[in-house]
């Protein structure tokens, strides 16, 4: 078995990562490709937890702009993340990876309720654990969910898998041709410079709990495995 740098990993997977080129909804072929990448990580012996976003289905801020109460819109977003959790669970189990979906909002007919010690036990048994439903409270993003769950399960790292962006830049590299990429940053750098890595609540929580992040392009095959093995790709935030 290959040597790995990070034993217990929390992967933040955006909803858009499951929608393919459409950018909205669900794409089975994309989910299959993502699942195969995750199986590689699992087969290395890493304990893998996943936090799903919901942006391919719904964003709370979208509803707020349309005149919805923010809390109500956020609850819709939480339900979107549960759909994504079930979708990636199916893709993983189709290729033989045992998984559990755990939700912050109880819906026992669909998934297990989130219980921290039970989640840790699943990881110890080699199951991939998918955290869905956000934190269960409105006004908190899935970035914050990632930082919270990583702290709760004592994850060694948060992997921020990005679509088509290979790290953290001082400007949007898709819009600014000479944007500068950072190889290493501190959490305080991210906060003070206003870099778009994760929201400020998530950044502060990661800093306070000494959880490193690696921001990388998930569209390049094998990158998740490379990060877990300790290869220097993307941007590391510590």
UniProtKB/Swiss-Prot annotation:
UMP binds at residues 54, 74, 135-142. Residues 20-25 are annotated as: Involved in allosteric activation by GTP. ATP binds at residues 12-15, 55, 59, 163, 169, 172. Transmembrane segments: none annotated. Keywords: Allosteric enzyme, ATP-binding, Cytoplasm, Kinase, Nucleotide-binding, Pyrimidine biosynthesis, Transferase. Allosterically activated by GTP. Inhibited by UTP. GO terms for cellular component: cytoplasm. Coiled coil: none annotated. Its EC number is 2.7.4.22. GO terms for molecular function: ATP binding; UMP kinase activity. It comes from the Bacteria. Homohexamer. This is Uridylate kinase. It comes from Lactococcus lactis subsp. lactis (strain IL1403) (Streptococcus lactis). The lineage of its organism: Bacteria, Bacillati, Bacillota, Bacilli, Lactobacillales. The gene is pyrH.
């Amino acid at each position: 078995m290959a040597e790995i740098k990070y034993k217990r990993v929390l992967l933040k997977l955006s909803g858009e990562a499951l929608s393919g080129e459409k950018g909205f909804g669900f794409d089975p072929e994309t989910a299959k490709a993502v699942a195969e990448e995750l199986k590689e990580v699992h087969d290395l012996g890493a304990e893998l937890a996943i936090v799903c976003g919901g942006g391919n289905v719904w964003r709370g801020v979208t509803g707020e702009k349309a005149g919805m109460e923010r809390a109500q819109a956020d609850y819709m977003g939480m339900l979107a993340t549960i759909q994504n959790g079930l979708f990636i669970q199916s893709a993983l189990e189709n290729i033989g990876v045992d998984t559990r979906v755990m939700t912050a909002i109880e819906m026992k007919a669909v998934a297990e309720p989130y219980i921290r010690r039970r989640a840790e036990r699943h990881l110890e048994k080699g199951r991939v654990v998918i955290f869905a439903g956000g934190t269960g409270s409105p006004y908190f993003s899935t970035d914050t969910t990632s930082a919270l769950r990583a702290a709760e399960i004592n994850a060694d790292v948060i992997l921020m898998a990005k679509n088509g962006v290979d790290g953290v830049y001082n400007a949007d590299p898709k819009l600014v041709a000479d944007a500068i990429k950072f190889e290493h940053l501190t959490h305080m750098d991210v906060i003070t410079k206003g870099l778009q890595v994760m929201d400020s609540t998530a950044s502060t929580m990661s800093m306070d709990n000494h959880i490193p992040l690696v921001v990388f392009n998930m569209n390049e095959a094998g990158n998740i495995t490379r990060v877990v093995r300790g290869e220097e790709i993307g941007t590391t935030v510590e």
